[in-house]
Curated annotation (Swiss-Prot):
Top-level taxonomic group: Eukaryota
Tissue specificity annotation: Expressed by the skin glands.
Location of this chain's protein in the cell: Secreted
Lineage: Eukaryota, Metazoa, Chordata, Craniata, Vertebrata
Record organism: Nidirana okinavana (Kampira Falls frog)
Family of this protein: Belongs to the frog skin active peptide (FSAP) family. Brevinin subfamily.
UniProt entry tagged with the keyword Secreted: yes
Major place of residence: secreted
Lysine amide, modified sites: 21
Keyword Secreted (UniProt): yes
Cellular component terms per the entry's GO annotation: extracellular region
Signal peptide coordinates: none
Segments passing through the bilayer: none
Keywords attached to this entry: Amidation, Antimicrobial, Secreted
Record-given protein name: Brevinin-1OKb
Amino acid sequence: FFPFVINELAKLPSLISLLKK
């Protein structure tokens, strides 16, 4: 469970920076 959550949280900043571009 935790590895999956951490993986999803790690993806969020890159998705947000892509949207901000």
